[in-house]
């Protein structure tokens, strides 16, 4: 199958229709979409551009959720907006804080579906791990999240809404007499490494990230946004052209035989095809390098030979290799490589001239670590459902 073949998923998802008589959500609309919506609502043509700028700043620079708080708009115009539109973000169902400061939010979106969002504080940055789909279609054998079937894609509003609720919790919207732009940002980076494959939901992810990068709003540099893909080859060049963010690749193996088992998408776009697509990305996107993510699995992909083969495979690609200790989960078919084995693997890569940081697991005590998202929640709810069925209370 060629690298330009149409992309398909196990589950076909369709955009959700607006309920009869429902209001359109302004969160997630691009500037052109917002202009079109305001014009259709009766905004005079000569005022549309000005109104877009005003509303955009209220939504994404100040975090306002009530049209009545948009004080530089006339009251009749605020009433018109409130009559036809809403400002809606995902509902926070639960919030857990790890011993290491990691925060995990379970959020509910349209249709009653739930996804998880993780905030990871560090000394020099604060990173938000964002989801792009409900469930996942990739079935990577080492990832617990991948055992959960794909339900649907998230909308651009549901994706950017995750950023907004995290800023709510962190208190990072302006208050009278305070300008957060003059302060160290608590939420400074975004990684599209939550539930789902971002490149299987390209348009919504692109629009959400464009909103996050807009200098008149959330204003995050594209260098502070990293999109992680398992290797959807046909969309990689498009990502460079239309988003231009940093790119991470879930690589995890140095032979097709092993990667076919760990990351089944490799059966469609193998290692050679993937690497060919990646070689042009740093130049096309004006990004410094590509991050190769490599989960360390005992006796599977952690030998010295694997390390040397990895270095040979990526030769010529500006890159760093993130080594990820496997986050074990009940029933997992793999074990974490020993610390000594991981360090030896990292040393081979480092001596070949590549940065090879070993990721420190974060949020394990609240099931917020890599590959664990939503798993504990689903297990708990399944258990409650089983109990209810057994007792006749379901």
UniProtKB/Swiss-Prot annotation:
**Pfam families, per this entry?**
Radical_SAM, RlmN_N
Q: Which InterPro entries does the UniProt record give? A: Aldolase_TIM (IPR013785), Methyltransferase_A (IPR040072), RlmN_N (IPR048641), RNA_MTrfase_RlmN (IPR027492), rRNA_lsu_MTrfase_RlmN/Cfr (IPR004383), rSAM (IPR007197)
Q: Could you confirm whether the keyword Transit peptide appears in this record?
A: no
**Co-factor binding comment:** Binds 1 [4Fe-4S] cluster. The cluster is coordinated with 3 cysteines and an exchangeable S-adenosyl-L-methionine.
Key word Disulfide bond present: yes
**Gene3D superfamilies noted in UniProt:** 1.10.150.530, Aldolase class I
User: Which molecular function terms from Gene Ontology are attached?
Assistant: 4 iron, 4 sulfur cluster binding; metal ion binding; rRNA (adenine(2503)-C2-)-methyltransferase activity; rRNA binding; tRNA (adenine(37)-C2)-methyltransferase activity; tRNA binding
Annotated protein name in UniProt: Dual-specificity RNA methyltransferase RlmN
